[in-house]
């Protein structure tokens, strides 16, 4: 026998070694569902308008400052490097208009939605929580005095929370698919600004859900910046090749101004999510209150 006392084992829900192991994965997944759900309920969030777009698009001020800096460094770098730096800096200045447009559109939407009589917050501007277009949309909503959501993702580069997210609605996800779930689940509208791989991934996933009618709601979709998107994606070629139906092009609208986009979104959101009560669809009874079209 020994007089040495055995230490108590850690409680399972406080055992970091277990929680961060493969065996604890299901609990981590449930946490990224249950914790956001709890906060959305507490913050009285009914539904959202999601903005997707590049983290690499800067404001006019930042882009012009960078261009001035590049011009000032001309004597310190090789001609080849200077040419490349100028090309990127000038492109950033050109793309900066999308930052300002996202900011303007988010402000218009928030000013309108804040006037909707409802028990919960309607059509809350939501982004991926990072810089670029995400920052611009959160900024516009913040300037309008509304709540605004950031669904951030833990990455080794590029992603950090912008300062315009409502602090109590700032989220950090480990799993991409859980983050995507919350984008899709609460969204009643989607605005896609110019972006790269991440934006395309997010857009096409929700577009596919809408096209296959896997969403138990009508989602209003705007592709912002027709010149950019028509250069990046040839939707007409997909129709001509028989890969999609011509009617699939009605799933979204191309737009080039904040005011035009706002009117389209307002009309669609009013028609599908603020109008007279429509017949329930299969699965409506299982939808938590925060995600329903009407309280």
Show which residues each predicted segment covers.
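Short, solvent-exposed amphipathic alpha-helical segments in soluble enzyme
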Residues: 66-69, 142-143, 205-210, 237-240, ...
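C-terminal functional extensions of proteins
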Residues: 223-295
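Phosphate/pyrophosphate-binding betaalpha-module
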Residues: 126-193, 197, 204
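Glycine-rich beta-alpha loop segments
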Residues: 3-151
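Solvent-exposed alpha-helices and their adjacent loops that cap or buttress functional pockets
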Residues: 41-44, 116-120, 142, 162-164, ...
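Short, acidic/small-residue loops that bind anionic groups at enzyme active sites
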Residues: 145-158, 193, 207-231, 247
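Residue-level recognition of the N-termini of beta-strands and the immediately preceding loop/turn
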Residues: 121-124, 217-221, 249-252
């Amino acid at each position: 026998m020994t007089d040495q006392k055995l230490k108590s084992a850690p409680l399972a829900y406080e055992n970091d070694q277990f929680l961060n192991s493969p065996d604890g994965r299901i609990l981590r997944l449930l946490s990224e569902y249950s914790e956001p759900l709890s906060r959305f309920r507490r913050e009285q969030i009914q539904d959202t308008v999601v903005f997707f777009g590049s983290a690499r698009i800067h404001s006019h001020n930042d882009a012009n400052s960078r261009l001035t800096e590049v011009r000032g460094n001309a004597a310190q770098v090789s001609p080849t490097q200077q040419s490349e730096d100028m090309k990127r800096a000038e492109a950033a200045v050109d793309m900066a208009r999308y930052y300002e447009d996202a900011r303007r559109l988010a402000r218009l939407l928030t000013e309108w939605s804040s006037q909707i009589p409802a028990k919960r917050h309607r059509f809350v501007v939501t982004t991926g929580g990072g810089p670029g277009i995400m920052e611009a949309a959160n900024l516009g909503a913040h300037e309008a005095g509304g709540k605004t959501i950031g669904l951030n993702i833990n990455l080794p580069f590029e992603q950090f929370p912008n300062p315009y997210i409502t602090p109590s609605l700032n989220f950090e996800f480990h799993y991409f698919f859980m983050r995507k779930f919350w984008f899709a689940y609460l969204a009643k509208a989607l605005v896609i600004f110019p972006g790269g791989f991440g934006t395309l991934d997010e857009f096409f996933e929700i577009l596919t859900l809408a096209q296959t009618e896997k969403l138990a709601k009508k989602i209003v979709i705007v592709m912002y910046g027709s010149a950019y998107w028509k250069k990046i994606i040839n939707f007409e070629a997909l129709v001509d090749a028989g890969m999609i139906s011509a009617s699939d092009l009605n799933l979204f609208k191309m737009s080039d101004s904040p005011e035009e986009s706002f009117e389209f979104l307002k009309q669609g959101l009013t028609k599908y999510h603020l109008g007279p009560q429509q017949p329930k669809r299969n699965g409506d009874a299982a939808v938590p209150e925060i995600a329903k079209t009407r309280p």
